[in-house]
Amino acid sequence: MRCLGIDTSNYTTSAAVFAGEVLENRRMLLPVKPGEKGLRQSDAVFHHVRQLPQVLAPILEKGEAMDAVGVSVSPRSAEGSYMPCFLVGKGFAQALAGAWCVPIEYFSHQQGHIAAALYSAGKLDLLTKPFLAFHVSGGTTEALLVAPDRDGMPKAVLAAQSLDLKAGQAVDRVGVMLGLPFPCGPELEKLALRWTD
């Protein structure tokens, strides 16, 4: 089964093709002005509308049939969890799934983080049983109780969270002070890997 996944989160436009393994993984960071610590949602939406066709083009140009489309539609699987930037991916995904006459699956950005972590760790078997996950990303520092829902997707229930500055925000603030482009995590990681003392 060949599936196209789309995610238009607050700072990255992403698309991937998966068929038992990752066949394509394309992404573009949203441009953030030097010294800024983020984007307004209206700016994020604007950039996703411009970037998603560029991200999808190399995938779609191959003309390979897809069996399903998956798309993140909210930050978390919780009532009231909403950011306008996810509407861009949702609209593109619905159009593609409709044109291809294939099913579409909706999930949260957080579910994507959980599934990606399990995939990269070779632990997809955990999707069939309850486990504890730590989601440390951007504006999120949370401990989550995760169990499969009736569709087999990871359903996360908040167990604990930071009450002040989130870990990702701390990384970004330090990075901006160092003059790095936002979001700063990838650039700080490169600096750390180059450090020899």
Residue ranges and their predicted role:
Residues M1, V102-L132:
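Conserved phosphate-binding catalytic cores of ATP/NTP-utilizing and phosphoryl-transfer enzymes
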Residues T12, S72-S77, S108-I114, T140:
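Acidic, glycine-rich active-site loops and adjacent beta-strand->loop/helix elements
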Residues A57-Q94, G98:
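Short beta-strand-loop/turn "lid" adjacent to the catalytic site in phosphate-handling enzymes
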Residues T13-A19, A115, A133-H135, T141-L145:
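Short beta-strand scaffold segments in enzyme catalytic cores
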Residues G5-I6, G70-V71, I104-H109, L165:
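General beta-strand structural signal in soluble alpha/beta enzymes
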Residues R27, R40, A44-E64:
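Conserved phosphate-binding loops in N-terminal lobes of ATP-dependent enzymes
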Residues T8-S9, E24-N25, L127-K129, H135-V136, ...:
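A short helix-loop
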Residues T8-F46, D151-A159:
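Short glycine-rich, Thr/Ser-proximal phosphate-binding strand/loop in the N-terminal lobe
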